[in-house]
């Protein structure tokens, strides 16, 4: 590309020009015995039940709310109890968890005044109000108040 005089001048000032290599034609031969690189495995899971974990937290400090959100992010059902949390921190914890619930498209259910259940979006939690009322009247599951 460059003539000899230009090349010498550029070499003198410290710039080296490399010749572009002409592309060589490479002949491709297909190996008859080679397996395709992107072979997808054919796996069928039979009889594997959904294994959903339930995590229970008895929170005492606001700093512990991160554990609830981390468990929810891992698609675990989380039950958390706020009975031992100072009154001024309860609303902050509920707000924090509510933000995580919104971001992760999860659901939060109030079990009692200070006990909540948070479920990931892949899980439906249905509460039968009639059954809940029956339990309350009989004193079964006192936390359902």
Curated annotation (Swiss-Prot):
Keywords: Cell cycle, Cell division, Cytoplasm, Septation. The keyword Coiled coil does not apply. Residues 23-41 have a biased composition (Basic and acidic residues). One of its GO terms (biological process) is division septum assembly. Residues 23-42 are annotated as: Disordered. It is found in: Cytoplasm. InterPro entries: Cell_div_SepF (IPR023052), Cell_div_SepF/SepF-rel (IPR007561), SepF-like_sf (IPR038594). GO terms for cellular component: cytoplasm. Cell division protein that is part of the divisome complex and is recruited early to the Z-ring. Probably stimulates Z-ring formation, perhaps through the cross-linking of FtsZ protofilaments. Its function overlaps with FtsA. Homodimer. Interacts with FtsZ. Belongs to the SepF family. This is Cell division protein SepF. It comes from Caldicellulosiruptor bescii (strain ATCC BAA-1888 / DSM 6725 / KCTC 15123 / Z-1320). The gene is sepF.
